[in-house]
Design a protein with these regions (language model features):
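Extracellular ligand-binding interfaces
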Residues: 26-105, 110, 121, 125-134, ...
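Short, tryptophan-glycine- and acidic/Ser/Thr-enriched carbohydrate-recognition patches
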Residues: 1-7
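Short carbohydrate-recognition loop motifs
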Residues: 8-34
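Extracellular recognition modules
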Residues: 115-117
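Generic alpha-helical scaffold signal
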Residues: 1, 16, 47-49
Length: 147
């Protein structure tokens, strides 16, 4: 479930940057949970030297540990390296080199969707857990230059 159950639908007090964050509840009993945004503009992720996808997330200590992932174009899935990322109670930045998606076959000049999910994508046989996550500041960046 994306958004709060009551108005306002976006989170206004528990944010990393700006004035709102996206709450995302997951319930993975014999399934996985995800939110997808279909892109109609800004689909060329090779322009201006962009090389990284960055997002900030925050969980709740009582969350059931679940794998966190990002998928592009509905197929290429990159998992966070911490299997209990859903239990991190401090805002945590996750930077994904876009080359990881390219290595999985994504045409970065034509990104049609981005998905943020929890659990094992495609799983319909293993019991999972529940929890509440917050997502903020999803952005593309050029590579960082070492000082």
């Amino acid at each position: 479930f994306v958004g709060n159950s009551d108005v306002p639908l976006t989170e206004r007090s528990n944010v990393h940057g700006g004035s709102q964050a996206m709450p995302l509840s997951y319930s993975n009993n014999l399934k996985f949970s995800e939110a997808t945004r279909t892109l109609t503009a800004g689909r060329d992720w090779t322009r201006q030297g962009v090389a990284e996808l960055s997002l900030w997330f925050r969980g709740v200590a009582a969350n059931t540990p679940e794998r966190m992932y990002v998928a592009l174009n509905g197929t290429a899935v990159v998992y966070h390296n911490d299997p209990s990322a859903t239990q991190k109670t401090a805002w945590t930045r996750w930077v994904i080199p876009l080359q990881q998606f390219a290595n999985l076959g994504v045409n970065l000049a034509n990104v049609t969707s981005i998905t943020i999910g929890f659990g094992t994508r495609g799983n319909t046989t293993t019991a999972g857990g529940t929890g509440q996550m917050y997502i903020d500041d999803v952005r593309l960046y050029r590579p960082r230059v070492a000082p």
